[in-house]
Amino acid sequence: MMLHAQHMPGQPGAPSLVFLHGFSGDCREWQPVGEQFHGCSRLYIDLPGHGGSTAIPVGGFADVIRLLRATLISYNILKFWLVGYSLGGRVAMMAACQGIPGLCGLVVEGGHPGLQNEQARAERRLSDGRWAERFRREPLTEVFHDWYQQPVFASLTAQQRQTLTALRSQNNGETLAAMLEATSLAAQPDLREALNALAFPFYYLCGERDSKFRALAQEVAATCHVIRNAGHNAHRENPAGVVDSLAQILRL
């Protein structure tokens, strides 16, 4: 089994870029940024429970990474950079720390490296469980209205919240809930030590108004790019700034 994806071929010898979206996004999320790198091969993946991969079930991170590997092989992508946002960034970090073959570099935007104690994990497990139950039972417009009131999204304007709520409400609540539980931050190990031992380039992007993830970026051995005029979802709020950072990272 493989994940649904959209593949755009590039020029021979150019880097291959593999993009992983955040929770409730899909393969279109990164395209305004990725399509500025038309010389590179670009693979935009739908994570399980999302987009064209809605019907693909997973029990945890191991399943997601197994599916990611199978998808890369199916497209004959043997050497690549992983670029992931939030949930996609956590999947990318997990894949990197587990030694996914062919990975040349890692770019994470607003991805959490992991909770550091059992109390924090227990609290997160309860929180994600409550959200999952709401995604299963309530109209998605109501759930996402509340979802985007969380502190991490404080920099969004009312119009941005309204737009995102309408967009994300097109998802399947049952499969979102299953993916939220399977890849909960509570189920993710603390990756700091493993990330600090990576043998390939590791870059971290965060919006200048995203104080939580700017602080987390200092806890990993990554080169940090702060994206101006942006909060947690920097590639949506300032795509040109993220394009500039990626161009510097990839030396394009």
Swiss-Prot record:
The keyword Lyase applies. The keyword Transferase does not apply. Pathway: Quinol/quinone metabolism; 1,4-dihydroxy-2-naphthoate biosynthesis; 1,4-dihydroxy-2-naphthoate from chorismate: step 3/7; Quinol/quinone metabolism; menaquinone biosynthesis. One of its GO terms (biological process) is menaquinone biosynthetic process. Its EC number is 4.2.99.20. It catalyses: 5-enolpyruvoyl-6-hydroxy-2-succinyl-cyclohex-3-ene-1-carboxylate = (1R,6R)-6-hydroxy-2-succinyl-cyclohexa-2,4-diene-1-carboxylate + pyruvate. GO terms for molecular function: 2-succinyl-6-hydroxy-2,4-cyclohexadiene-1-carboxylate synthase activity. It comes from the Bacteria. InterPro entries: AB_hydrolase_1 (IPR000073), AB_hydrolase_fold (IPR029058), SHCHC_synthase_MenH (IPR022485). It is an enzyme of class 4 (lyase). Keywords: Lyase, Menaquinone biosynthesis. Catalyzes a proton abstraction reaction that results in 2,5-elimination of pyruvate from 2-succinyl-5-enolpyruvyl-6-hydroxy-3-cyclohexene-1-carboxylate (SEPHCHC) and the formation of 2-succinyl-6-hydroxy-2,4-cyclohexadiene-1-carboxylate (SHCHC). Belongs to the AB hydrolase superfamily. MenH family. PANTHER family: 2-SUCCINYL-5-ENOLPYRUVYL-6-HYDROXY-3-CYCLOHEXENE-1-CARBOXYLATE SYNTHASE, PROTEIN PHYLLO, CHLOROPLASTIC. Monomer. This is 2-succinyl-6-hydroxy-2,4-cyclohexadiene-1-carboxylate synthase. It comes from Salmonella heidelberg (strain SL476). The gene is menH.
